[in-house]
Amino acid sequence: ANAVYEGTDAVMLSGETAMGSYPIEAVRMMSQIAEESEKYLDYMFYQRRKVSAENLRNISNTVCYSSVATASDLEAPVIVAPSVSGFTTRMLSKWRPKALIAGLSPSMTAVRQMQLYWGVKPFHAKRAESTDALLFASVELLKEKGIVKEGEIVVATAGVVTRANRHEPVADTNIMRVMVVE
């Protein structure tokens, strides 16, 4: 429980516990303790903490912070974060939102890495041709998986290519959109 309260992204069993007579039960118990502990976190503490001036001028950091604050203000249960590399989900995770972060990526490497990020539930997803198609497909996948329901408000954030930089990779998380699940 202390590891959760201190903001740890992941916990693991010690060698002795993992090799003991009941390793599966030990993992289940650790999971239950972590999930129960998360119910009592002061999520606003993470949003109120001081941020360096350098991070305040960082586009990705600011968009992710704004997404977390908006999700909190609107009581959105999910932040939708499509990301090829998982960068957006990692940036969101550092703010420890109360909302679930749904990380979606076409890269299985990124999906596996996102399993270690705090508050992120990763999903494998296909690439999309446009920003609208990306966000629509992301929400549809989450609807199919039972993560979001019709009528819920979700906050979506991603790094998308602009028309001016169409041939360059996305370097920043640069959009946030508030959506009602249809």
Language-model features, listed with the residues they occupy:
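Glycine-rich phosphate-binding active-site loops on the catalytic face of alpha/beta enzymes
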Residues: A1-P23
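Conserved, mostly hydrophobic/aromatic
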Residues: A3, L92, V154
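Generic secondary-structure signature for well-ordered alpha-helical cores
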Residues: Y5, D9-A10, S31-Y43, V68, ...
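Nucleotide-binding motor/catalytic cores of P-loop/tubulin-like NTPases across gene-expression machines
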Residues: T88-R90, R96-A133
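Beta-strand/loop-dominated core regions that host nucleotide or nucleotide-derived cofactor-binding catalytic loops
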Residues: K121-H124, F136, E140, T162, ...
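Short, small-residue-enriched loops and turns at beta-alpha junctions
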Residues: T17-Y22, A53-R57, T131
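Long, charged amphipathic helices and adjacent flexible linkers at domain junctions
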Residues: M30-S67, I175
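C-terminal helical cap(s) of enzyme catalytic domains, especially alpha/beta-barrels
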Residues: T17-K39, P169-M179
